[in-house]
Amino acid sequence: MAKYLVIVESPAKVKTIKKFLGKNYEVAASNGHVRDLPKSQLGVDVEHDFEPKYITIRGKGDILANLRKEVKKADKVYLATDPDREGEAISWHLSKALKLEGKDVNRISFNEITQSAVKASLKQPRDIDMNLVNAQQARRILDRMVGYKISPLLWAKVKRGLSAGRVQSVALRIICDREEEINAFIPEEYWTLDAELKIAGEKKPLLAKFYGDSESKMNISSREEMDRVMAEISKETFKVIEVKKGERVKKAPLPFTTSTLQQEASKALNFPISKTMRIAQQLYEGVDVKGQGTVGLITYLRTDSVRISEEADAQAHEYIGKNYGENYLATQTTAKKSGAKIQDAHEAIRPSDINRTPAMVKDSLSRDQFRLYQLIWKRFAASRMASAVYETTNVKIGAGNYRFTVSASKIAFDGFMSVYTSEDDEKAENNVLLKSIDESTELSLEKLDEKQHFTQPPAHYTEASLVKTLEELGIGRPSTYSPTITTILARRYIVKENKNIYVTELGEVVNQIMKESFPSIVDEHFTANMESLLDSVGEGTVNWKTVIENFYPDLEKAVEAAEKDLEKVKIEDEVTDVVCDVCGRNMVVKYGPHGKFLACPGFPECRNTKPYLEKIGVKCLKCGKEIVLKKTKKGRKYYGCENNPECDFMSWSRPVEEKCPKCGGYMVMKGSKIVCADEQCGYVTEKKEKNQE
């Protein structure tokens, strides 16, 4: 009897796939990549056609030895690694490391780990796709070149252990740009006005929102203007001008891609992106389900496609018709593609079997596994269902030359919303008072309620919104979003507080160096174009070495220029007037994982360190002591009094010496302006040269 060997990446897959195949099949795991570029050198021969020098990864020798033994026993070898460019590269490296060239080697791939999918793949073996392999090689080599060439410059300029990366540096730049926008933002005053109107015969008042005059929408920006408008409105008679009843259709959502799953799990489940990917991997590779054994519950998790197979679509059609009714079936499923580049090699993320409902597997899953599976299941079911329909009522009310509006909506047909709603879905606003209102309805003013507001700065990025931005800009791919964010968090270039992402002092320094010395590396358009070229390599339309040949000379020139310019941007050890209380030397400023600190220059003989308090030359308005630049425990910068905790002064923006001439309060820097810290005051002036940082 012939013997067959199936090689996959993970032991979890081995357990799931083994039960699908007969006794003449052996299933073994490579535990991920087995070969890579050496860590101790560039690993690319730039003099000889950029040939990579691969070595066996440390710790993989025993795994390869065991695989070689299994290969000798097998008549046929199947390489069943993941169905993407990374998986294709692992299969190719295995074929080289195991010397399979003379063997009957077959590449198989499947989008879900189910018996039918695995057995179908065995009937359709193929050769290793060298276009995908070369796309992965090009990506790996480009990333190595950037990291290997630029990281030592960061070590020289800032501290050892820092890193630069082709995608991570752009992500950091995007976050820093948003932080600068927020810091430079100056709030602007605006007012809203609501009218409580009495309807004849009704106890409850109707709440109408001020719109403007008969010509256009009005924006009211001051107390004086609001008082004038209110005085004029108070004299007028209110009457219904127009009632419009209509219908609004809300389309079903698309099934999940990697990025939309990461975004929704972050918003709905409060999962960090790394956690979402870890749990999705478990659901894909297989979970022990009571009465069914090990089952792969979802399709492959790294995808930017919204395509659904005909079989899965038909299965969903049958399930929805049976459980919800024919009227809940989509007449045409939404099939939109978005983003700068879509790799449509896979399906969307969906349950491997829609009949395996969340309730059926709940007792077999951990709480987090269940919550993520339920989210995926509901989203997929919703994507195959009919649109929701809202009944809408919009009323226009006149008060002389001024206009107010009232709007309401209610769900007439819930459609897909019977299964799935997201945080972004609008809430129905059912105003029963609008049911009988028409142009003849008598209205009288009971009360005008004005409110002062101030515009808000752009929101800080969250992991979810950052992934959305990276995808929209075409930066990175489904497999890179999570490791990119994980890396810049681990390097402490950024920190997270209550989901929001903040740049640390270390992140600001690294970003500034990258912008000055390597502008193309942190340019989003350059990076997106490079991603597009790598996709073209995977499609076989661009030679992978041509991409590297075109990239490397410019990188070399930039590195050489940065090395020559090193002294201009290097952060030297700054000697302070703080005396080391151990040995008496003047302490110096150093960079650590959390930013600046004071260290004794007598290291290693003297290891004394102290927190670094950077004075900004401004006295505290509360107690007269110095204001210093501080950091929260997680690394966010703020300004506080050196006399803390006795004095509780604190500001996120940099204070200046001058007091506000309007209210006497303290003022802060906002971009090119100096503004009063009290929004109610609203005083703004141009920044003077001496106050510039």
Question: Would you name each region that the model predicts?
Answer:
Residues 2-5, 16, 25, 97, ...:
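Basic, low-complexity terminal or inter-domain segments flanking catalytic cores
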Residues 1-140, 211-212, 220-223, 227:
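Intrinsically disordered, low-complexity regulatory segments
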Residues 240-243, 251-265, 292-301, 457-469:
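Short acidic, hydrophobic short linear motifs in intrinsically disordered regions
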Residues 16-20, 66, 89-97, 117-121, ...:
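Alpha-helical scaffold elements adjacent to nucleotide-binding pockets in ATP/GTP-utilizing enzyme cores
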Residues 216-254, 441:
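Metal- or metallocofactor-binding catalytic centers and their adjacent structured scaffolds
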Residues 139-149, 167, 197-199, 248-260, ...:
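Core structural elements
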Residues 82-83, 159-163, 245-254, 266-272, ...:
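Conserved short loop/turn motifs at secondary-structure junctions
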